[in-house]
Amino acid sequence: MILVSVSGGKDSTATLLCAIELHGPENVKGAFADTGNEHAETYDYVRYLQAATGVQIKWLRQDFSEWWLQRRTYIAEKWPLKGVGPDIVARALAVFDKGPTGNPFLDLCIIKMRFPSRTAQFCTTHLKTEPLTEHAIEMLDHYGAVESWQGVRADESPNRARLPSYEYLGGGYSIYRPILRWTADDVFGAHRAAGIKPNPLYLQDMTRVGCMPCINTNKAELRAISKRFPEHIDRIEEWEHVVGEVSKRHNA
């Protein structure tokens, strides 16, 4: 079975379209890892893709309840032994005692006691890679063999340029990157050829349509987000305050 990681972005959409053209929609499944930090238009677009292509797209959303309790226990039992002041411990526990917020991105930041950054992209690992991998393993149990198609392109970064097009990881599980050597123009061309609209955010000065905003977003795009979608900037500011409450230094 072909499993395509769908993000709502142009590259994963082109990958989905390639899989459908080569194998037919009946032999393709999609999986969307909902980080809890997406734009509403992206959620709508993923639903549109499922309806337009006929491919079932499974929505995945991390639950950090167990990790949350472990972190709360660590703060309550270990911080005092490490000399952390009682006021700081009480401030952090006040947040954890409310329980998980139910938003994967925010819960992860609270547990980590910080926001992700370009040098600490734990968001990708925990919110996307882990749930998608777990889902692929579940599919292996059902289908016996799963080929995970990933929409990454070499011209996006030096690290991605070094990735192979195909990897067999054993146990019937493999990874294929069909658009690794494609350009952005090639990607949008695939949309046009299949009669599929791109994510509307691309027409609103956005170059990234995953997390809103992504930690890798440049200043120009942040400026565009603040003008077009100020509510997302306000939301991040609110989340920074919450995360700051569990930080020893009172910042996010």
Task: List the predicted regions and their residue ranges.
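Nucleotide-activated chemistry modules centered on ATP-dependent adenylation/adenylyltransferase
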Residues: 1-252
